[in-house]
Each structure stands twice: as structure tokens, then as C-alpha cells.
Regions:
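A short beta-strand-to-alpha-helix junction
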Residues: 45-48, 66-71, 95-98, 115-124, ...
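Beta-strand elements within well-structured catalytic alpha/beta cores of enzymes
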Residues: 23-35, 54-55, 79, 130, ...
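Active-site segment of extracytoplasmic enzymes that catalyze sulfate/phosphate-ester chemistry
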Residues: 28-29, 35-124, 135, 148-163, ...
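C-terminal cap/loop subdomain of S1 sulfatases and analogous C-terminal strand-loop tails that border
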Residues: 17, 269-274, 302, 309, ...
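Bacterial Sec-dependent N-terminal signal peptides
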Residues: 1-22
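Histidine-centered active-site microenvironments of extracellular/periplasmic hydrolases
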Residues: 47, 151, 248-305, 311-312, ...
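Long, internal low-complexity/basic segments
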Residues: 21-24, 31, 35-36, 61, ...
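Active-site His/acidic residue clusters
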Residues: 183-232, 267-279, 424
Length: 461
């Protein structure tokens, strides 16, 4: 190689290295089935989360964070695409055995599961868009949309459907519970190759099975609380320990200053004394299902603040893309928060939206078929409307079609329905919901007359 070629190679390689260094690494941490109250930094009197406490203290912390749909797969698909469930068509965890879905499969020659997964091909994904911008990426933990490659990740753990066990993570579900080696190896390789990386860390924690290490369980059974509750509390601390390991590795590699770390939960979970979860938590449109703290941490770039504004998980994708200098293909419904995270200025938004559907999808091409609730929060007030979608195998369904209006500041448990006393506010907030979108074929204020079978109810306990 002559001197000119050596010079050109060095120049090009040097420019690429500078390009890589200017792009932040991105770490998205997703906990699984955890209440917004169940952290030390959120005021829980018993659960210890020292590593998340430290992260929150170094971050922009949104205590009023929300996911628009409080169920595993829809929540994760929103984080993968930046879109609402009614936009990306992943409204539930699995396709239901319905005439509509049978008709779709007969026409296409594909299974309903495959047709559902194909939505990730149609709308694209955060990993794909970041890949177009020069990122390498790794999937670990929960992932429903086929293999990690199909999700646009360059590396990963999940084999996915139609592989055996490939419903929602298979080998990926080992991360955290069985160590952190795959994640650490990916980080080490990315740093050695001088490539910016995106890490999807979605451990199956504190999700069931609640089988924490005995050393943690002993801490929480000592006070005489019910065993099911003690196990859940210990699982929350176990999750925290894995996050501590991850953050230590990032610090030890000397890349913390150039790494944007984001934390969010897929949905809430209020632990019942005898096992399982309470009604107004996972799957529900209430605070116990949809609310969770959202954290953005990037030392020297994101201003440390305890932020009072509303935040939604829909903001995460556009914010990540902006930080990475990558343009996505959609007009995302969420906000790019990066300018306000850097400046510390107030986010000029006081309204966010959400929707809840049946656990199983009645019509994989029509999201409204399974629509059960829509909600809007404006300031401190929340309006919740019911709809007459097919409940399928829902564990809990609405008992009434009455509008529900709550003052979340005065009544965070949503016990006092103010709708009858404030018809004008109900009307105003209903108008906002219909400006958001009108669900064709569904009627607000009604509930489905269809009953789920005993077999379906047992399946989803």
C-alpha cells in the first residue's frame, strides 16, 4: 500500500471513528410487571432499589410516566415502533380463535401468529432505524415479534416464532435471571470495534415466576408479610441488582458519559396477598396499570431534574432517534424530548392518551374489534370511557359503561368518580378523545354482552 492510500485509509477510518464517538450509545432498560410505587425513590416503605435510586438521582425523572396500553406485547411494540397499538396493530398478546382471524389465515395461507408478527416488517423498528444510522444492536429479554433479526437487531438472544418456545422471548428470558454475560460481551465487542450501540435490556423481572434468590426472599419474609408479597418484593430487588451490574459494566468500560440510559416498565402490577395481581393493575387502564416512572440519564447532556410534567413511553423512540441523529420514517405521536431534557425547560404538553384492548386479539386486521377502554389525562384530570369490543379471555372486564372522571392529584387511587358532578369536563375531554381518533364500529359508554368462557378465564389467570 503506497503512502497516499495509507493516508486516505487513515483519514477515512479516523472520520468513521469520530462519527461513532459522536453518536451516543443507547441503553433501553425495561422492567416487566412492576407497580409505579414499587421503588425506594418512589417512596415504597419496604422495597429496596439502591441502583435504580442512584440512576434516578442522576437523571431526568418523570414520576408521572405512562404507557398507553398496559399489557406486555402492546407495551413493548410501542417501545419498538413509537406508535400506538391501534397504529401498529399489536393490541394484545395473542390472536384469538375467532371467525375473523380464521378468514384472514385462509385468505393469506399464513398463520394468525405469523400475520401478527409481520406488522414489525410493515412499520419498521427502532433497531432497524438505528442500524441505518450506523448502530449495532442487541436484543435480550422479552421480545414477541419473531427472531431478534426480524426486529432489526444485529445481535440477540431470542429465536422467536415459529421456533419451539418462541412466543415472547425463549432464550432471551434467561438474561438477568441467569447472568449478564451475553449483554456484557456485546458491550465489550461494540466498544472494541468503536461502534455506537443500542441495547434492548428487557429481563423477565420481576415478572412471574416469582422465584427470587433465597438471600433476598429472607429479607422480605422477616417482617411477616404474606409469602406471595414477599416474593414479589424480592423480585423487584433482584431486577435492581441486575441493573446495578449493567451500570457498573458501562462505567468500567469508560463509556458512561457517552451513553444515554432510559428506564421504563411495560405495565403495572399490584401484588395480591394470595398470589396473582389485583384488578386495577396489569391490563387495566387505571393508574396501577398504566403509570410508571420514566428515566432519561445522560451525564453532562441531560439535565438532572425531578420533572413534574406528564411523559409517555411514546416519547422514547423519537427522543432516542434525535439523540442518535437518525431520522425515522413516521410522524411519531410522541415528542422528541431531547431539547427540553438538555435545557431543563418545561415541556409544553398537558395532555396524553391511552387505550386498552382484550388480552387476545379478536381481529388481527381491525384493532377496534377488541377495544375495551380509551383514556385521556389533561393536567390532573383523567377521563376513562368504556367500549363494546370483544373481551375474549379478559380476566377482568368493566361492570358498567358509565364515564369515569378522576382528579389524580386529590384521588390517585381513582376511587371517586366525578363524572356526574362535572358533565362539562366530561364533554370537553370526550371531545379530545375523538380528536385523537374515532374508533369505527365501537360505541362509547357500552360494554360487550359477550362473556368469556370458564376455560378462557382460567387460561388467563
Amino acid at each position: 500500500m503506497n503512502k497516499i492510500n495509507i493516508f486516505l485509509f487513515s483519514l477515512i477510518f479516523g472520520c468513521f471513528s469520530m462519527f461513532a464517538q459522536n453518536k451516543p450509545n443507547i441503553v433501553l432498560i425495561l422492567s416487566d410487571d412492576q407497580s409505579y410505587t414499587d421503588y425506594s425513590f418512589m417512596g415504597h416503605p419496604a422495597i429496596k432499589t439502591p441502583h435504580l435510586d442512584k440512576l434516578a438521582s442522576e437523571s431526568a425523572l418523570f414520576r408521572r410516566g405512562y404507557v398507553p396500553t398496559a399489557l406486555c406485547r402492546p407495551a413493548l411494540m410501542t417501545l419498538a415502533t413509537g406508535l400506538y397499538s391501534h397504529q401498529n396493530l399489536i393490541t394484545g398478546n395473542d390472536p384469538a380463535n375467532t371467525p375473523a382471524n380464521k378468514a384472514h389465515t385462509e385468505k393469506s395461507g399464513k398463520s394468525a401468529k405469523e400475520m401478527l408478527i409481520s406488522n414489525i416488517d410493515r412499520v419498521g423498528s427502532l433497531a432497524k432505524w438505528l442500524g441505518n444510522g450506523g448502530y449495532v444492536s442487541h436484543q435480550s429479554g422479552k421480545w414477541w415479534e419473531g427472531s431478534f433479526q426480524r426486529g432489526g437487531f444485529t445481535e440477540g438472544m431470542t429465536r422467536g416464532y415459529p421456533e419451539k418456545g418462541g412466543r415472547h422471548g425463549d432464550d432471551g428470558l434467561k438474561i438477568g435471571r441467569e447472568g449478564m454475560t451475553p449483554v456484557f460481551n456485546f458491550i465489550d465487542k461494540s466498544v472494541a470495534d468503536q461502534k455506537p450501540f443500542f441495547l434492548w435490556y428487557a429481563p423477565f423481572l420481576p415478572h412471574t415466576p416469582h422465584n427470587p434468590p433465597e438471600r433476598l426472599l429472607k429479607k422480605y419474609t422477616a417482617d411477616g408479610r404474606p409469602l406471595a408479597v414477599a416474593k414479589y418484593y424480592a423480585m423487584c430487588e433482584w431486577l435492581d441488582e441486575t441493573i446495578g451490574e449493567l451500570m457498573k459494566h458501562i462505567n468500567d468500560k469508560g463509556i458512561r458519559e457517552n451513553t444515554l440510559v432510559i428506564y421504563v416498565t411495560d405495565n403495572g402490577w399490584i401484588q395480591a396477598d394470595k398470589g396473582g395481581y389485583k384488578i386495577r393493575s396489569k391490563r387495566s387502564p387505571y393508574e396501577g396499570g398504566t403509570r410508571n416512572p420514566i428515566i432519561f440519564s445522560w451525564p453532562g447532556t441531560v439535565k438532572v431534574a425531578d420533572r413534574p410534567e406528564l411523559c409517555t413511553s411514546l416519547d422514547i423512540v423519537p427522543t432516542i432517534l434525535a439523540a442518535a441523529g437518525v431520522k425515522g420514517p413516521h410522524d411519531f405521536p410522541g415528542l422528541d424530548l431531547m431539547p427540553k431534557l438538555k435545557s431543563g425547560e418545561t415541556i409544553e404538553r398537558d395532555t396524553i392518551y391511552g387505550e386498552s384492548f382484550a388480552h387476545d386479539i379478536a381481529d388481527i386486521q381491525n384493532p377496534n374489534a377488541s377495544l375495551l377502554y380509551r383514556w385521556v389525562i389533561k393536567g390532573n384530570h383523567k377521563l376513562l370511557l368504556t367500549y363494546d369490543g370483544e373481551p375474549g379471555a379478559m380476566k377482568y372486564t368493566a361492570q358498567s359503561g358509565d364515564a369515569q372522571l378522576y382528579d389524580l392529584k386529590a384521588d390517585p387511587q381513582e376511587n371517586n368518580n366525578l363524572a356526574s358532578e362535572n358533565p362539562e369536563m366530561v364533554q370537553q375531554l370526550t371531545k379530545l378523545l375523538n380528536q385523537w381518533y374515532v374508533p369505527e364500529g365501537r360505541t362509547a359508554g357500552k360494554i360487550s354482552q359477550k362473556e368469556s368462557s370458564k376455560k378462557e378465564r382460567k387460561k388467563n389467570k
